[in-house]
Amino acid sequence: MFVDKRARSKFWLYCVITSLALCDIASAQKYVQTNLVSDVPGLAATTDPNCTAPPSKQGCAVLNAWGIAFSSTSPVWIADNGSGLSTLYTGAGGVVPLVVTVPPPKGATGHSAPTGIVFSGSAAAFQVTANGVTGNSAFIFDTEDGTISGWSPGVDLHNAILAVDNSGTGAVYKGLAIGQSSKGWFIFANNFNSGWVEIYDSNFQWVKNFTDTDLPPGYAPFGIQNINGKLYVTFALQDADKHDDVAGPGHGFLDVFDLDGNKLKRLISHGELNSPWGLALAPPNFGKFSGDLLVGNFGNGHINAFRIDDGAARGHMLRPNGGTLAIDGLWGLAFGNGAAAGPTNTLLFTAGPNDEADGLFGSLQAK
């Protein structure tokens, strides 16, 4: 059979171009994970200096590292769920010698269990008082104990101050966001037990609750993030006690609300979601997923990318060897601030590996 040489050349050229394109696509979604700080010796570049007798967890602070926040210039603040503390680091993993205690409910013994943390940019909102001194909160925490606390350095450098205590009603706060509208400053706390997102004003006074009433039974607000003035809220499946999530393929939803709690749209249903919690909008220089909404699954540790306008799936992060990037116990996601928290195209993450018994702070960069 005669085969035209020109046709054969075009065929091979097509094969080469296609192969190169596929290689380019695969490499573009590969990301390098760097473990910066952990309580587990050898897991990260730095072992938690608060650990007094490694490998035991005695004195350790970075346990089940959860929420992550910072100002435009500050280092990274992490809510350490397993120790009731907040520890500070640079974006490169340098230890900042300040440890803040997040208080438990009134009259409770033991440490608190902080989850969400936000930075407040207001000079007069969210004031707390202790020992006759009043100041605005720079960082605000919520906890699985059903409390919300504010940290004001002029009030107490080493302790956040209890501002809201709903432990008596069984509240279990899993996430926290902050936002400013024409009506003022507000915080938004995900009550996983009740299934509502609770809004509080700048005086820590309850305003109202909201949720997605179209969800299947058993789903409750899990993660939350203010992105470009809109609230992105993830929903996870509750366990029988309505305290923890039930992980599994497709177990999750993601909605978008305005700052008044009005649902704007359902962005993602099921699919690659698996107890989603971490949320971050990628900058324009983050490899294949530049400009995409990144959603971290606590359930399987995957980080999936979606178009932020319509929720179309864009794939998930891969390791340099082509395998799926999975971070055990993945929680928070946040891009650096271009200052102490690291480059703006470096994705910082927190995690509670080994069934939330340990903690990890690290970073991800496009390869």
Residue map of PLM features:
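Bacterial N-terminal signal peptides
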Residues: 12-23
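N-terminal secretory signal peptides that target proteins for export/translocation
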Residues: 1-9
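Short, flexible coil/linker elements and helix-boundary hinge sites characteristic
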Residues: 3, 21, 54-57
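Sequence/structural signature of beta-propeller domains
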Residues: 28-367
